[in-house]
């Protein structure tokens, strides 16, 4: 709406994936040109052979967390023994190992319940699972907005060092049209800078694409996302990626 992409000669169309679709597959098969997604699902897709490549980091810290309801009484990792955890197939189980270890537990002490993306909040609210693996600023705020006080265990508090969300594309696009990639990244950076001071106005554009979203709730989430940018990794340049952080991300 602000014309950042248009000024770079890009006619931008945002197309959220349908239920069951994986962003990385859409990019890797050439059906879409750019994607925004979680780093864990990207690493898994990349290792499977999809020709995708990261071009800009969005979140220098990971936002992943175990989220439970206060009423469930899980107030420490040690209390997670026997819990049912809502889990997506694209998640990497090793991400919660340090948290479990801090409570003298391992993966065999909890039950992973595979769920369809989007169903985890309702399942936790209904008591079908004891906790979910999601975003500290995502499902947690959605549950609280619906009247369910939550307790959040961010995995970064347990020493997990990996990236959060990022922007990626097809390997061929970088080779054949590197200028387009540069212009896309440049426009994205400008839009992120503008959005920082215009959160609600920016979220109105998101709601137009995804009308099921609540403007006030999503604006609150976005403000929390911007807190992730206050990171030493970005002291030199916003969106900067380092080999050490990538190595840590891949090792997980």
Give names to the regions the model predicted:
Residues 138-139, 158-160, 173-174, 191:
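Short, catalytically relevant binding-site loops at active-site mouths
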Residues 175-252:
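Secondary-structure end/capping motifs
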Residues 1-137, 152-153, 160-161:
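Short, glycine-/small- and polar/acidic-enriched structural segments
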Residues 39, 94, 137, 167-168, ...:
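A generic alpha-helix surface/boundary motif
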Residues 148-150, 211:
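N-terminal secretory/targeting leader peptides
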């Amino acid at each position: 709406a602000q014309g950042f992409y248009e000024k770079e000669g890009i006619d931008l169309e945002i197309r959220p994936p349908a239920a069951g679709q994986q962003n990385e597959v859409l990019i890797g098969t050439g059906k879409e040109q750019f994607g925004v997604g979680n780093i864990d699902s990207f690493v898994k897709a990349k290792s499977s052979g999809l020709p995708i490549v990261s071009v800009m980091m969005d979140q220098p810290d990971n936002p992943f967390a175990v989220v439970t309801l206060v009423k469930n009484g899980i107030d420490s990792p040690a209390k997670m023994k026997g819990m049912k955890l809502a889990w997506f197939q694209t998640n990497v189980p090793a991400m919660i190992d340090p948290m479990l270890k801090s409570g003298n537990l391992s993966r065999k002490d909890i039950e992973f319940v595979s769920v369809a993306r989007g169903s985890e909040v309702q399942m936790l609210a209904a008591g079908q699972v004891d906790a979910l693996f999601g975003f500290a600023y995502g499902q947690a705020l959605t549950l609280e907005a619906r009247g369910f006080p939550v307790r959040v265990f961010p995995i970064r508090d347990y020493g997990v060092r990996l990236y959060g969300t990022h922007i990626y594309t097809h390997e061929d696009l970088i080779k054949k049209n590197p200028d387009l990639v540069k212009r896309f990244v440049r426009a994205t950076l400008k839009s992120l800078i503008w959005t920082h001071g215009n959160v609600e106005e920016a979220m109105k554009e998101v709601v137009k694409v995804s009308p099921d979203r609540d403007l006030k709730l999503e604006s609150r989430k976005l403000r929390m996302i911007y807190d992730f940018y206050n990171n030493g990794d970005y002291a030199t340049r916003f969106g900067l990626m380092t080999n050490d952080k990538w190595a840590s991300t891949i090792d997980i």
